[in-house]
Regions:
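Intrinsic-disorder/low-complexity accessory segments
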Residues: 18-137, 144-165, 220, 226-228, ...
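Substrate-binding cleft of carbohydrate-active enzyme catalytic domains
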Residues: 179, 203, 209-213, 225-237
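Acidic, His- and aromatic-enriched active-site or binding-groove loops in soluble protein domains
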Residues: 187-214, 219, 265-282, 322-323
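Carboxylate/His-rich catalytic cores and anion/metal-binding grooves
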Residues: 147, 164-190
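Sec-dependent N-terminal signal peptides
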Residues: 3-13
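Active-site-proximal loop/turn and secondary-structure-junction residues that shape catalytic pockets
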Residues: 173-175, 250-252, 331
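Proline-aspartate-enriched helix->loop->beta-strand connector
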Residues: 237-251
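Active-site neighborhood of phospho(di)ester-bond hydrolases with catalytic His/Asp-centered motifs
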Residues: 128-130, 170-172, 245-248
Length: 552
């Protein structure tokens, strides 16, 4: 009798957890394990480690013909960053052909450019990006629920989604930060749960899980492209050019849920068509509101956050000709916490993210044709707008610090920007498909629609690298760079019996010092400038220049 009661309780607990999240999309394929069945605990009972999230996504790609999985980067701590492609079996079998057709439809520079008036022939590409801030963890749990629903649900509604879309699920953009946070909250979780905001579970020690291994905010790195997680994601964007990019976040515990539109009078990126903000985001917002109304969750929009800085993950989706948006869920910062509105639990935050993610797919499918037309107009207008402008490009020289110039050109090339080279002169034409990204990198904006905005107010990468560049009203000649392998010739170093000198003006000096010290080579540094007669003549050396003695 006790065993029967226990089994009934287990069954009811499992049934409740499933009904709480995705009852709406039943029935499900019994041959595919739910996240709870795979992990061994209900979603929201624990914070799930990144390796288990990857394992579940791998499992789904192995058992279903509606999914395929790819790795796009590896974090500093060796964790794989992956995305799961979900669509109908027919589309999964032809995914590479569909990807290339999508690019041919939207990009006028493509050799197979399709001037088609039938966007209905193409699926909408939806990029769902989760957990760029590691201690905003609800979204990665929701990613597993979303993947399971799209793959396992037998509902006609979900079938329609898969017939008309390619859904790219990136469950953990910042795996190192997530696991740092996961370790903290699971370690300090109490039984019973402690909802006191002062409890250790809800108060990570610095630096917390927000940032990556080197404590960098990956949601400020998209233009800079410094870290491997971001560089892989940038390449992902240019492989797919999604129509919709959704970025999932959390905010302060004493809040509710935010979705677009942004602040009504907020500053917006001046290079992005207003249609993005004033039309599409309004329509998406109506879908999000309806979805949260159905489950009785509170929300707000138009009162916070803005689109000033083009280096957020959501903003980069705009530069791809898509609609980039974000969700902000009030965080439980653990498993349960008391707020001014009552208790907030981890499962509650997960459900809101899950419902909003599914409504992103729904809205994208409903607006598919409009989104496809907008993206095609976006890139076509890039070329015509560039023709109308006085500035035809930006020029700069190799300069004294060749490695710094090389690093800057690397940033241009990872953003799929064309760079022309003529001896030691470089030219970046504005007339190219990523015209708006070129403007974002070179232009210096000093006027904004609002005096109050979220954070970053300056982002010119050209100025970040201190590049001495000029705008040009004339087109320039040159050969387009394919790679950086032979950007400049490295001078041969003559053998010395006394010492070697390295001027500190070079961008790669820190890397050189690291390499020399790790090789047990003695290195001295200059505390003031000096000149010296070398085999190449009299040469000035600056502060911090390196002296490597051959013998002492």
């Amino acid at each position: 009798m006790k065993k029967i009661i226990l089994l009934n309780l287990i069954f009811l607990s499992s049934l409740y957890s499933q009904d709480y999240y995705y009852e709406k999309y039943a029935p499900f394929d019994e041959n595919i394990k739910s996240p709870e069945e795979f992990l061994g605990y209900p979603i929201g009972e624990m914070h799930t480690r990144h390796d288990l999230i990857v394992s579940y996504m791998t499992y789904l790609s192995n058992v279903s013909d509606k999914a395929d999985m790819f790795s796009y980067a590896t974090s500093y701590e060796g964790r794989k960053l992956i995305y799961l492609i979900v669509s109908s079996p027919e589309k999964i079998n032809n995914i590479e052909k569909i990807r290339k057709s999508h690019l041919s439809y939207i990009r006028p520079d493509d050799e197979n450019y399709i001037q088609s008036d039938k966007p209905s022939d193409f699926p909408v590409i939806i990029n769902l990006g989760y957990n760029v801030h590691g201690n905003e963890p609800s979204s990665s749990e929701a990613a597993m629920l979303t993947a399971y629903t799209l793959i396992s649900s037998k509902s006609k509604e979900v079938e329609k989604y898969l017939q008309n879309s390619i859904v790219l699920i990136d469950p953990t953009i910042n795996p190192d930060g997530r696991d740092r946070h996961t370790q903290w909250v699971n370690s300090y979780k109490g039984s019973p749960l402690v909802d006191d905001p002062q409890d250790a579970e809800h108060n990570e020690y610095w630096p917390g899980g927000r940032t990556n291994h080197y404590w960098f905010d990956l949601n400020r790195d998209v233009l800079l492209g410094i870290h491997p997680e971001t560089r892989g994601k940038i390449e992902f964007h240019h492989n797919w050019y999604p129509n919709v990019t959704m970025d999932f976040h959390e905010m302060g515990t004493n809040s509710t849920y935010f979705f677009v539109p942004w602040k009504t009078h907020a500053a917006k990126d001046p290079v992005i068509p207003q249609e993005n903000y004033e039309y599409f985001e309004r329509l998406f917002g109506e879908f999000f509101a309806k979805g949260l109304d159905e489950i009785g969750s509170m929300y707000f929009s138009k009162e916070a956050f803005d689109k000033t800085y083009p280096g957020y993950h959501s903003s980069y989706g705009d530069l791809m000709g898509g609609i980039g948006m974000l969700f902000e869920q009030a965080s439980s910062r653990g498993h349960k916490q008391v707020t001014q509105f009552g208790e907030i639990t981890f499962p509650f935050t997960i459900r809101n993210q899950y419902v909003s993610g599914m409504n992103t797919v729904k809205a994208s499918v409903e607006m598919k044709d409009e989104l496809m037309k907008y993206q095609q107009r976006f890139f076509a207008s890039a070329l015509t707008d560039a023709d109308k402008k006085r500035i035809k490009g930006y020029s700069f020289k190799m300069g004294k610090d060749r490695n710094k110039t090389k690093a800057f050109i690397d940033k241009l090339m990872i953003h799929d920007i064309s760079v022309l080279k003529d001896n030691d002169n470089f030219f970046v034409p504005t007339k190219q498909k990523n015209y708006r990204t070129v403007r974002s990198i070179f232009e210096t904006n000093t006027e904004f629609r609002d005096s109050v905005f979220y954070d970053a107010s300056a982002w010119s990468i050209a100025n970040f690298y201190d590049i001495d560049y000029n705008s040009s009203s004339k087109d320039s000649q040159g050969v387009e760079l394919d790679n950086l392998d032979n950007l400049f010739t490295v001078n041969k170093i003559d053998e010395s019996e006394y010492a070697y000198l390295i001027n500190s003006v070079d961008y790669n000096i820190p890397a050189v010092i690291n390499s020399l010290v790790n090789s047990d080579i003695i290195v001295s540094t200059a505390f003031k400038p000096f000149t010296i007669n070398t085999s190449s003549g009299i040469i000035p050396f600056d502060y911090g220049s390196l002296v490597i003695p051959v013998s002492l």
